């Protein structure tokens, strides 16, 4: 959700229980504007909160002029002092995939994991137990990146692609119509497309290249991993991810108000295919 309209955005997303105390809201409003100025971001998004056992991580993201360029991620424990996180890598994801359970809320906390490594002694090969330490900060980076790739959402038409390449905010976007807002096909993943290149030429011919340049939610696997609900007498559409419980996307049809927020433990619902 855009930091500049934070209070309205939190109000619209509050149906899922994603609220913040008045002092946290005031701190965020001020500190995110300073983050935008100091890091020279085009936009700052309040991404959400990852709940820890000792403390919670408040997450913000900086967006450059090209809206699909990699976003810079920052975290804070008090909503005032922000620290920049390193970019996520495949190695981080592999390393942290073995860590299960809740976050602690301490970036310097280290998880211990025992794994078997092959050791050569002459012609003989032995398997030796090695204790690997994984920092919570590394796990935080990896989980945020996974959530972004899987469930960050944007409505169709909110961004447009110029013939020269850069992707910009569509200043003429006036919101989806009520009938369009109820369809999953009207929402895209807010990331570089992955499935788009697999479409046939006939399917691509039906798309508008300036608007349909991202992957649609309607083809997400497993099918049924999104819940779409109309609230406030059809004045608000709310999408909730069942794969990453805690992710809520909201959009008020026929207005420019949209955004998403994640408030959860940072754990994926791996049982979802068996629950549907």
From Swiss-Prot:
Predominant subcellular localization, coarse grouping: cytoplasm
Function: Functions as part of axonemal radial spoke complexes that play an important part in the motility of sperm and cilia. Essential for both the radial spoke head assembly and the central pair microtubule stability in ependymal motile cilia. Required for motility of olfactory and neural cilia and for the structural integrity of ciliary axonemes in both 9+0 and 9+2 motile cilia.
Keyword annotations: Cell projection, Cilium, Cilium biogenesis/degradation, Cytoplasm, Cytoskeleton, Flagellum
Disulfide partners: none
Protein name: Radial spoke head protein 9 homolog
Subunit structure: Component of the axonemal radial spoke 1 (RS1) and 2 (RS2) complexes, at least composed of spoke head proteins RSPH1, RSPH3, RSPH9 and the cilia-specific component RSPH4A or sperm-specific component RSPH6A, spoke stalk proteins RSPH14, DNAJB13, DYDC1, ROPN1L and NME5, and the RS1 complex-specific anchor protein IQUB. Interacts with IQUB. Interacts with RSPH3B. Interacts with RSPH4A. Interacts with RSPH6A. Interacts with CFAP61. Interacts with LRRC23.
Gene Ontology cellular-component terms listed: 9+2 motile cilium; axoneme; kinocilium; radial spoke head; sperm flagellum
Keyword Oxidoreductase: no
Species, as recorded: Bos taurus
Family listed: Belongs to the flagellar radial spoke RSP9 family.
Subcellular location: Cytoplasm, Cytoskeleton, Cilium axoneme; Cytoplasm, Cytoskeleton, Flagellum axoneme; Cell projection, Kinocilium
The keyword Cytoplasm belongs to this UniProt entry's keyword annotation: yes
GO biological process terms, semicolon-separated: axoneme assembly; cilium movement involved in cell motility; motile cilium assembly
